[in-house]
């Protein structure tokens, strides 16, 4: 397997190197894909079409790596975590609780970054909700 050699300097800025433009999709396995799609639509308002295309609003996207032993994602079996930007975290968490979703009791504030809350989907995937600062 060939790996791209990592460098400490952002050499792509000066080299004319092609760059990715953004996240093009997020794909997950599910025991019942249709039901999980309905959950994301009904609980989070994710309006994807029949092909899964969802036109999201503008805003920042975070790409971060974590130590392999992190407990931040919930279950150790979960290798990635989906994060959605939200306008009003408290309103979203209230809405999710009203729909019977598994919402974590705690929230987290990060100065200059925003507020975070978490919900677990019916397949057991922990999802982070982020209200940017």
PLM region spans:
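Conserved short beta-strand elements that form part of the metal-binding/catalytic scaffold
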Residues: 44-79, 119-122, 126-132
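Short alpha-helical
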Residues: 34-35, 90-91, 114
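Core segments of cupin and vicinal oxygen chelate
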Residues: 17-23, 27-64
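Mid-chain, well-packed structural core segment of small domains
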Residues: 75-96
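Secondary-structure boundary/capping motif
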Residues: 35-37, 81, 116
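A generic alpha-helix structural signal
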Residues: 37-40, 93, 97
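Vicinal oxygen chelate
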Residues: 2-28, 94-133
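Acidic di-acidic motifs
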Residues: 32, 88, 121
């Amino acid at each position: 397997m060939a790996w791209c050699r990592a460098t400490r300097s952002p050499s792509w800025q000066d080299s004319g190197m092609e760059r990715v433009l953004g996240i093009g999709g997020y794909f997950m396995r599910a025991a019942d894909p249709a039901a999980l799609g309905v959950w994301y639509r009904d609980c989070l308002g994710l309006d994807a079409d029949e092909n899964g295309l969802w036109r999201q609003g503008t805003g920042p996207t975070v790409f971060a790596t974590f130590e392999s032993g992190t407990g931040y994602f919930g279950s150790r079996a979960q290798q990635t975590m989906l994060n959605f930007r939200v306008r009003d975290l408290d309103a979203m968490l209230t809405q999710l609780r009203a729909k019977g979703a598994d919402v974590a009791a705690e929230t987290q504030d990060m100065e200059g970054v925003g507020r975070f809350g978490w919900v677990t989907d019916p397949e057991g995937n922990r999802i982070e909700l982020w209200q940017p600062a």
